[in-house]
From Swiss-Prot:
Phosphoserine PTM positions: 102
Residues annotated as transmembrane: none
Cofactor: Mg(2+)
Protein name as annotated: Phosphoglucosamine mutase
Protein purpose: Catalyzes the conversion of glucosamine-6-phosphate to glucosamine-1-phosphate.
Amino acid sequence: MSRLFGTDGVRGLANADLTPELALSVASAAARVLYERDDSRRRVALVGRDPRASGEMLEAAVTAGLTSAGADVLRVGVLPTPAVAHLVSAMRADLGVMISASHNPMPDNGIKLFAAGGHKLPDAVEDEIADRLDERVDRPTGAAVGRARDVPDAGSRYVDHLLEATPQPLDGLRVVVDCANGAAAAVAPSAYRLAGAEVIALNAEPDGLNINEGVGSTHLDGLRAAVREHRADLGLAHDGDADRCLAVDATGSVVDGDQIMAILAVAMKEAGELADDTLVTTVMSNLGLHLAMREHGVKLRTTAVGDRYVLAELREGGFSLGGEQSGHVVLPDHATTGDGLLTALRLMGRVVETGRSLAELAATMTRLPQVLVNVRVADKATACGAPEVAKAVAEAEAELGDEGRVLLRPSGTEQLVRVMVEARSEGTAQRVAGRLAELVAAIR
Protein backbone atom coordinates (compact mmCIF):
# COMPACT_ATOMS: atom_id res chain seq x y z
CA MET A 1 0.00 0.00 0.00
CA SER A 2 1.40 3.40 -0.97
CA ARG A 3 1.96 6.12 1.62
CA LEU A 4 -0.66 8.83 1.99
CA PHE A 5 2.16 11.36 2.34
CA GLY A 6 4.41 11.67 -0.68
CA THR A 7 7.74 13.47 -0.87
CA ASP A 8 5.92 16.80 -0.64
CA GLY A 9 2.90 16.06 1.54
CA VAL A 10 -0.57 14.91 0.49
CA ARG A 11 -1.46 15.82 -3.09
CA GLY A 12 -4.23 15.07 -5.55
CA LEU A 13 -7.11 16.40 -7.60
CA ALA A 14 -8.97 18.73 -5.26
CA ASN A 15 -12.47 17.60 -4.29
CA ALA A 16 -11.87 14.20 -5.91
CA ASP A 17 -8.67 12.70 -4.48
CA LEU A 18 -8.06 15.41 -1.90
CA THR A 19 -11.53 15.93 -0.47
CA PRO A 20 -12.62 18.22 2.38
CA GLU A 21 -13.30 15.08 4.41
CA LEU A 22 -9.72 13.86 3.94
CA ALA A 23 -8.33 17.32 4.72
CA LEU A 24 -10.36 17.47 7.94
CA SER A 25 -9.22 13.98 8.94
CA VAL A 26 -5.54 14.73 8.28
CA ALA A 27 -5.68 17.96 10.29
CA SER A 28 -7.56 16.37 13.19
CA ALA A 29 -5.19 13.39 13.33
CA ALA A 30 -2.17 15.70 13.21
CA ALA A 31 -3.48 17.69 16.17
CA ARG A 32 -4.15 14.51 18.17
CA VAL A 33 -0.67 13.17 17.50
CA LEU A 34 0.82 16.45 18.71
CA TYR A 35 -1.29 16.43 21.88
CA GLU A 36 -0.24 12.91 22.77
CA ARG A 37 3.40 13.91 22.61
CA ASP A 38 2.74 16.69 25.14
CA ASP A 39 -0.74 17.37 26.53
CA SER A 40 0.43 19.96 29.07
CA ARG A 41 -0.88 22.94 27.11
CA ARG A 42 -3.23 24.01 24.35
CA ARG A 43 -1.73 23.60 20.88
CA VAL A 44 -1.50 26.28 18.18
CA ALA A 45 -1.47 25.54 14.45
CA LEU A 46 -0.72 28.03 11.68
CA VAL A 47 -2.51 27.60 8.33
CA GLY A 48 -1.65 29.22 4.98
CA ARG A 49 -2.52 28.56 1.35
CA ASP A 50 -1.80 29.51 -2.22
CA PRO A 51 -4.54 31.29 -4.22
CA ARG A 52 -5.95 28.36 -6.22
CA ALA A 53 -9.74 28.11 -6.07
CA SER A 54 -9.95 24.97 -3.95
CA GLY A 55 -7.73 26.49 -1.28
CA GLU A 56 -10.59 28.23 0.49
CA MET A 57 -12.57 24.99 0.73
CA LEU A 58 -9.59 23.03 2.04
CA GLU A 59 -8.58 25.80 4.44
CA ALA A 60 -12.04 25.62 6.00
CA ALA A 61 -11.79 21.83 6.31
CA VAL A 62 -8.29 21.95 7.81
CA THR A 63 -9.37 24.63 10.29
CA ALA A 64 -12.38 22.53 11.29
CA GLY A 65 -10.19 19.46 11.79
CA LEU A 66 -7.67 21.28 13.93
CA THR A 67 -10.16 23.13 16.12
CA SER A 68 -12.31 20.01 16.56
CA ALA A 69 -9.24 18.34 18.06
CA GLY A 70 -8.70 21.23 20.48
CA ALA A 71 -6.01 23.21 18.65
CA ASP A 72 -6.20 26.96 18.13
CA VAL A 73 -5.65 28.12 14.54
CA LEU A 74 -3.80 31.14 13.17
CA ARG A 75 -4.95 31.78 9.58
CA VAL A 76 -2.29 33.67 7.61
CA GLY A 77 -4.13 33.55 4.27
CA VAL A 78 -2.41 33.50 0.89
CA LEU A 79 1.35 33.35 1.43
CA PRO A 80 4.31 31.36 0.06
CA THR A 81 5.16 27.99 1.57
CA PRO A 82 8.45 29.34 3.02
CA ALA A 83 6.49 32.13 4.70
CA VAL A 84 4.36 29.57 6.51
CA ALA A 85 7.48 27.64 7.56
CA HIS A 86 9.09 30.84 8.87
CA LEU A 87 5.98 32.01 10.71
CA VAL A 88 5.54 28.65 12.43
CA SER A 89 8.90 29.31 14.05
CA ALA A 90 8.53 33.08 14.52
CA MET A 91 5.05 32.82 16.08
CA ARG A 92 5.99 29.73 18.12
CA ALA A 93 3.25 27.57 16.66
CA ASP A 94 3.27 23.83 17.24
CA LEU A 95 2.24 22.89 13.71
CA GLY A 96 2.16 24.49 10.28
CA VAL A 97 -0.19 23.56 7.45
CA MET A 98 0.39 24.79 3.90
CA ILE A 99 -2.40 24.15 1.40
CA SER A 100 -0.79 24.14 -2.03
CA ALA A 101 0.16 21.92 -4.96
CA SER A 102 3.19 24.08 -5.78
CA HIS A 103 3.86 24.04 -9.55
CA ASN A 104 1.02 21.59 -10.32
CA PRO A 105 -1.99 22.68 -12.42
CA MET A 106 -4.82 24.61 -10.78
CA PRO A 107 -7.24 21.66 -10.30
CA ASP A 108 -4.73 19.92 -8.01
CA ASN A 109 -4.06 20.83 -4.42
CA GLY A 110 -2.07 19.52 -1.49
CA ILE A 111 -1.42 19.62 2.23
CA LYS A 112 2.10 20.01 3.58
CA LEU A 113 2.79 19.83 7.32
CA PHE A 114 5.53 21.57 9.29
CA ALA A 115 6.66 20.75 12.82
CA ALA A 116 7.42 23.32 15.50
CA GLY A 117 10.42 25.34 14.34
CA GLY A 118 9.25 25.23 10.72
CA HIS A 119 10.87 21.95 9.67
CA LYS A 120 9.07 19.29 7.65
CA LEU A 121 7.56 16.50 9.72
CA PRO A 122 9.60 13.28 9.90
CA ASP A 123 8.28 10.34 7.86
CA ALA A 124 7.46 8.41 11.03
CA VAL A 125 5.16 11.17 12.30
CA GLU A 126 3.45 11.47 8.90
CA ASP A 127 2.87 7.71 8.92
CA GLU A 128 1.40 7.87 12.42
CA ILE A 129 -0.99 10.61 11.28
CA ALA A 130 -2.01 8.52 8.25
CA ASP A 131 -2.62 5.45 10.45
CA ARG A 132 -5.00 7.40 12.68
CA LEU A 133 -7.24 9.10 10.15
CA ASP A 134 -10.27 6.92 10.87
CA GLU A 135 -9.96 6.35 14.61
CA ARG A 136 -12.96 7.14 16.79
CA VAL A 137 -12.08 9.44 19.69
CA ASP A 138 -13.79 11.59 22.28
CA ARG A 139 -13.69 15.14 21.00
CA PRO A 140 -13.24 18.21 23.19
CA THR A 141 -16.33 20.24 24.03
CA GLY A 142 -17.10 23.63 25.49
CA ALA A 143 -14.07 25.82 26.16
CA ALA A 144 -11.74 23.01 25.08
CA VAL A 145 -12.76 23.37 21.42
CA GLY A 146 -10.10 25.24 19.46
CA ARG A 147 -10.55 28.83 18.27
CA ALA A 148 -9.49 30.36 14.95
CA ARG A 149 -8.32 33.87 14.13
CA ASP A 150 -6.74 35.69 11.21
CA VAL A 151 -3.24 37.21 11.28
CA PRO A 152 -3.54 40.37 9.13
CA ASP A 153 0.15 41.30 9.36
CA ALA A 154 1.51 37.85 8.49
CA GLY A 155 2.76 38.98 5.09
CA SER A 156 4.60 42.01 6.45
CA ARG A 157 6.22 39.86 9.17
CA TYR A 158 7.59 37.57 6.47
CA VAL A 159 8.83 40.46 4.32
CA ASP A 160 10.60 41.97 7.34
CA HIS A 161 12.35 38.63 7.87
CA LEU A 162 13.46 38.54 4.22
CA LEU A 163 14.89 42.05 4.36
CA GLU A 164 16.78 41.29 7.58
CA ALA A 165 18.32 38.24 5.91
CA THR A 166 19.43 40.22 2.82
CA PRO A 167 21.05 43.48 3.96
CA GLN A 168 22.48 44.38 0.51
CA PRO A 169 20.42 47.32 -0.91
CA LEU A 170 19.27 46.73 -4.48
CA ASP A 171 19.18 50.39 -5.56
CA GLY A 172 19.63 50.82 -9.30
CA LEU A 173 18.59 47.28 -10.21
CA ARG A 174 15.70 46.80 -12.64
CA VAL A 175 14.06 43.38 -12.37
CA VAL A 176 11.08 41.61 -13.90
CA VAL A 177 9.39 39.07 -11.61
CA ASP A 178 6.92 36.41 -12.76
CA CYS A 179 4.70 35.55 -9.80
CA ALA A 180 2.94 32.65 -11.59
CA ASN A 181 -0.41 34.11 -10.46
CA GLY A 182 0.42 32.32 -7.24
CA ALA A 183 1.39 33.03 -3.66
CA ALA A 184 4.39 35.16 -4.65
CA ALA A 185 2.02 37.85 -5.91
CA ALA A 186 1.10 38.69 -2.32
CA VAL A 187 4.63 39.60 -1.25
CA ALA A 188 7.39 39.32 -3.88
CA PRO A 189 6.96 42.63 -5.76
CA SER A 190 6.68 44.61 -2.52
CA ALA A 191 9.64 42.82 -0.91
CA TYR A 192 11.89 43.50 -3.89
CA ARG A 193 10.80 47.15 -4.05
CA LEU A 194 11.42 47.62 -0.34
CA ALA A 195 14.92 46.22 -0.92
CA GLY A 196 15.49 49.02 -3.43
CA ALA A 197 14.90 47.39 -6.81
CA GLU A 198 12.76 48.76 -9.62
CA VAL A 199 10.21 45.98 -10.17
CA ILE A 200 8.09 45.07 -13.18
CA ALA A 201 5.61 42.43 -11.99
CA LEU A 202 4.16 39.80 -14.33
CA ASN A 203 1.31 37.41 -13.60
CA ALA A 204 0.67 39.00 -10.23
CA GLU A 205 -3.14 39.02 -10.39
CA PRO A 206 -4.29 35.61 -9.17
CA ASP A 207 -7.99 34.89 -9.57
CA GLY A 208 -7.98 31.35 -8.19
CA LEU A 209 -8.05 29.81 -11.66
CA ASN A 210 -4.94 31.15 -13.41
CA ILE A 211 -2.19 29.87 -11.09
CA ASN A 212 0.70 28.26 -13.05
CA GLU A 213 -1.31 28.56 -16.29
CA GLY A 214 1.50 28.82 -18.84
CA VAL A 215 3.47 31.09 -16.49
CA GLY A 216 5.99 30.93 -13.66
CA SER A 217 9.15 28.89 -13.23
CA THR A 218 8.05 26.08 -15.56
CA HIS A 219 7.13 28.43 -18.44
CA LEU A 220 9.88 31.01 -18.92
CA ASP A 221 9.23 32.33 -22.44
CA GLY A 222 7.07 35.24 -21.28
CA LEU A 223 9.63 36.30 -18.69
CA ARG A 224 12.47 36.11 -21.20
CA ALA A 225 10.59 38.38 -23.60
CA ALA A 226 9.65 40.84 -20.83
CA VAL A 227 13.25 41.14 -19.63
CA ARG A 228 14.36 42.13 -23.12
CA GLU A 229 11.36 44.42 -23.67
CA HIS A 230 11.91 46.35 -20.43
CA ARG A 231 15.72 46.27 -20.73
CA ALA A 232 15.86 44.83 -17.25
CA ASP A 233 19.02 43.68 -15.54
CA LEU A 234 17.46 40.29 -14.89
CA GLY A 235 14.24 38.37 -14.48
CA LEU A 236 12.99 36.08 -11.72
CA ALA A 237 10.40 33.32 -11.91
CA HIS A 238 8.57 31.66 -9.03
CA ASP A 239 6.21 28.71 -8.94
CA GLY A 240 2.72 28.61 -7.42
CA ASP A 241 3.85 28.49 -3.79
CA ALA A 242 7.11 30.42 -4.31
CA ASP A 243 9.49 27.86 -2.87
CA ARG A 244 11.40 27.93 -6.18
CA CYS A 245 13.30 30.60 -8.04
CA LEU A 246 14.77 30.50 -11.53
CA ALA A 247 16.34 33.50 -13.23
CA VAL A 248 16.84 35.02 -16.67
CA ASP A 249 19.77 37.28 -17.55
CA ALA A 250 19.52 40.53 -19.52
CA THR A 251 19.81 38.68 -22.84
CA GLY A 252 16.97 36.30 -22.00
CA SER A 253 19.18 33.30 -21.22
CA VAL A 254 17.92 31.04 -18.43
CA VAL A 255 19.92 30.75 -15.21
CA ASP A 256 18.84 27.53 -13.50
CA GLY A 257 19.09 26.31 -9.93
CA ASP A 258 22.54 24.82 -10.44
CA GLN A 259 23.91 28.14 -11.67
CA ILE A 260 22.20 30.06 -8.88
CA MET A 261 23.75 27.71 -6.32
CA ALA A 262 27.17 28.15 -7.95
CA ILE A 263 26.87 31.94 -7.71
CA LEU A 264 25.75 31.84 -4.08
CA ALA A 265 28.33 29.22 -3.07
CA VAL A 266 31.20 31.33 -4.39
CA ALA A 267 29.80 34.43 -2.67
CA MET A 268 29.32 32.66 0.64
CA LYS A 269 32.77 31.06 0.51
CA GLU A 270 34.34 34.48 -0.06
CA ALA A 271 32.40 35.86 2.93
CA GLY A 272 33.28 32.90 5.16
CA GLU A 273 29.61 31.90 5.34
CA LEU A 274 29.77 28.55 3.51
CA ALA A 275 29.92 25.97 6.29
CA ASP A 276 32.77 23.52 5.74
CA ASP A 277 33.06 24.99 2.22
CA THR A 278 30.33 22.53 1.22
CA LEU A 279 27.34 22.69 -1.12
CA VAL A 280 24.57 20.08 -0.92
CA THR A 281 22.82 19.12 -4.14
CA THR A 282 21.13 16.13 -5.80
CA VAL A 283 22.28 13.51 -8.27
CA MET A 284 20.49 15.45 -11.03
CA SER A 285 22.70 18.52 -10.74
CA ASN A 286 24.75 19.15 -13.86
CA LEU A 287 28.31 17.88 -13.99
CA GLY A 288 29.29 21.45 -14.82
CA LEU A 289 28.38 22.40 -11.26
CA HIS A 290 30.72 19.72 -9.89
CA LEU A 291 33.58 20.91 -12.11
CA ALA A 292 33.04 24.59 -11.27
CA MET A 293 32.87 24.00 -7.53
CA ARG A 294 36.06 21.96 -7.67
CA GLU A 295 37.79 24.94 -9.29
CA HIS A 296 36.58 27.22 -6.48
CA GLY A 297 37.51 24.86 -3.65
CA VAL A 298 33.92 23.98 -2.79
CA LYS A 299 33.05 20.40 -1.82
CA LEU A 300 29.79 18.80 -2.97
CA ARG A 301 27.54 16.48 -0.98
CA THR A 302 25.09 14.65 -3.26
CA THR A 303 21.67 13.30 -2.25
CA ALA A 304 18.74 11.54 -3.89
CA VAL A 305 16.31 13.69 -5.88
CA GLY A 306 13.93 15.70 -3.69
CA ASP A 307 14.30 18.74 -1.48
CA ARG A 308 13.49 16.68 1.63
CA TYR A 309 16.75 14.75 1.09
CA VAL A 310 18.69 17.96 0.60
CA LEU A 311 17.16 19.35 3.79
CA ALA A 312 18.05 16.21 5.73
CA GLU A 313 21.69 16.37 4.59
CA LEU A 314 21.91 20.08 5.42
CA ARG A 315 20.62 19.49 8.94
CA GLU A 316 22.71 16.39 9.57
CA GLY A 317 25.95 17.97 8.34
CA GLY A 318 25.35 21.50 9.60
CA PHE A 319 25.84 22.91 6.09
CA SER A 320 24.64 26.34 4.97
CA LEU A 321 23.65 25.99 1.29
CA GLY A 322 21.89 23.36 -0.77
CA GLY A 323 19.28 22.86 -3.42
CA GLU A 324 18.14 21.45 -6.72
CA GLN A 325 18.48 22.27 -10.40
CA SER A 326 14.73 23.01 -10.43
CA GLY A 327 15.27 26.15 -8.35
CA HIS A 328 14.65 24.88 -4.82
CA VAL A 329 17.48 26.58 -2.92
CA VAL A 330 17.84 26.28 0.84
CA LEU A 331 19.77 28.69 3.07
CA PRO A 332 19.46 27.06 6.51
CA ASP A 333 20.88 30.03 8.41
CA HIS A 334 17.74 31.94 7.41
CA ALA A 335 15.11 29.39 6.34
CA THR A 336 13.99 25.87 7.15
CA THR A 337 12.88 25.04 3.60
CA GLY A 338 13.42 26.20 0.03
CA ASP A 339 12.58 29.90 -0.24
CA GLY A 340 12.26 31.40 -3.71
CA LEU A 341 12.08 34.99 -2.48
CA LEU A 342 15.11 34.69 -0.21
CA THR A 343 17.02 33.07 -3.07
CA ALA A 344 16.04 35.90 -5.41
CA LEU A 345 17.09 38.60 -2.95
CA ARG A 346 20.45 36.94 -2.34
CA LEU A 347 21.02 36.55 -6.08
CA MET A 348 20.15 40.19 -6.79
CA GLY A 349 22.33 41.26 -3.89
CA ARG A 350 25.30 39.49 -5.44
CA VAL A 351 24.72 41.29 -8.76
CA VAL A 352 24.70 44.67 -7.01
CA GLU A 353 27.59 43.83 -4.68
CA THR A 354 29.93 42.76 -7.49
CA GLY A 355 28.76 45.22 -10.15
CA ARG A 356 28.75 42.30 -12.58
CA SER A 357 25.84 41.22 -14.75
CA LEU A 358 23.93 38.05 -14.02
CA ALA A 359 25.31 36.56 -17.24
CA GLU A 360 28.87 37.17 -16.03
CA LEU A 361 28.12 35.64 -12.64
CA ALA A 362 26.37 32.64 -14.20
CA ALA A 363 29.54 31.95 -16.21
CA THR A 364 30.98 30.68 -12.91
CA MET A 365 29.85 27.31 -14.24
CA THR A 366 29.39 25.93 -17.73
CA ARG A 367 26.39 23.66 -18.14
CA LEU A 368 27.24 20.47 -19.97
CA PRO A 369 24.59 19.23 -22.41
CA GLN A 370 22.21 17.00 -20.47
CA VAL A 371 19.85 14.49 -22.10
CA LEU A 372 17.08 12.81 -20.11
CA VAL A 373 15.10 9.91 -21.59
CA ASN A 374 12.13 8.34 -19.78
CA VAL A 375 11.91 4.65 -20.67
CA ARG A 376 8.69 2.74 -19.93
CA VAL A 377 9.46 -0.77 -18.66
CA ALA A 378 7.59 -3.80 -17.37
CA ASP A 379 9.45 -3.73 -14.05
CA LYS A 380 11.76 -0.86 -13.13
CA ALA A 381 13.68 -2.83 -10.49
CA THR A 382 14.43 -5.62 -12.96
CA ALA A 383 15.48 -3.16 -15.65
CA CYS A 384 17.77 -1.19 -13.36
CA GLY A 385 19.33 -4.33 -11.90
CA ALA A 386 19.97 -6.22 -15.13
CA PRO A 387 23.66 -7.22 -15.54
CA GLU A 388 23.68 -6.18 -19.20
CA VAL A 389 22.48 -2.71 -18.21
CA ALA A 390 25.22 -2.40 -15.58
CA LYS A 391 27.80 -3.46 -18.18
CA ALA A 392 26.51 -0.92 -20.72
CA VAL A 393 26.55 1.88 -18.12
CA ALA A 394 30.15 1.04 -17.19
CA GLU A 395 31.16 1.11 -20.86
CA ALA A 396 29.41 4.46 -21.36
CA GLU A 397 31.14 5.94 -18.30
CA ALA A 398 34.51 4.75 -19.59
CA GLU A 399 33.76 6.33 -22.98
CA LEU A 400 32.81 9.69 -21.43
CA GLY A 401 35.62 9.75 -18.87
CA ASP A 402 35.84 12.89 -16.72
CA GLU A 403 33.89 14.91 -19.28
CA GLY A 404 30.55 13.18 -18.89
CA ARG A 405 28.23 11.32 -16.57
CA VAL A 406 25.59 8.59 -16.71
CA LEU A 407 22.73 8.19 -14.25
CA LEU A 408 19.96 5.58 -14.32
CA ARG A 409 17.24 5.83 -11.72
CA PRO A 410 13.73 4.40 -11.34
CA SER A 411 10.75 6.73 -11.20
CA GLY A 412 9.23 7.03 -7.76
CA THR A 413 5.64 6.84 -9.05
CA GLU A 414 5.58 5.01 -12.41
CA GLN A 415 7.10 2.00 -14.17
CA LEU A 416 9.73 4.20 -15.76
CA VAL A 417 13.50 4.25 -15.77
CA ARG A 418 15.05 7.68 -16.25
CA VAL A 419 18.24 7.61 -18.31
CA MET A 420 20.32 10.76 -17.90
CA VAL A 421 23.55 11.41 -19.79
CA GLU A 422 25.82 14.47 -19.72
CA ALA A 423 28.68 15.03 -22.14
CA ARG A 424 30.78 17.80 -23.64
CA SER A 425 28.62 17.78 -26.80
CA GLU A 426 24.87 17.45 -27.32
CA GLY A 427 25.46 14.84 -30.01
CA THR A 428 27.49 12.59 -27.74
CA ALA A 429 24.93 12.87 -24.94
CA GLN A 430 22.07 12.03 -27.33
CA ARG A 431 23.93 9.07 -28.82
CA VAL A 432 24.89 7.51 -25.48
CA ALA A 433 21.46 8.13 -23.92
CA GLY A 434 19.68 6.65 -26.93
CA ARG A 435 21.84 3.53 -26.84
CA LEU A 436 21.23 2.98 -23.12
CA ALA A 437 17.49 3.72 -23.40
CA GLU A 438 17.12 1.15 -26.17
CA LEU A 439 18.83 -1.49 -24.04
CA VAL A 440 16.76 -0.69 -20.94
CA ALA A 441 13.52 -0.87 -22.95
CA ALA A 442 14.42 -4.36 -24.18
CA ILE A 443 14.78 -5.83 -20.66
CA ARG A 444 11.97 -8.22 -19.80
